[in-house]
From Swiss-Prot:
Source organism, top-level taxon: Eukaryota
UniProt miscellaneous comment: On the 2D-gel the determined pI of this unknown protein is: 5.9, its MW is: 47.0 kDa.
Name of the protein in question: Unknown protein NF041 from 2D-PAGE
Amino acid sequence: DTHKSEIAHRQPDLG
């Protein structure tokens, strides 16, 4: 979802 996409932006490590 959008939240996950945001986290991916903040933590590229999670991909």
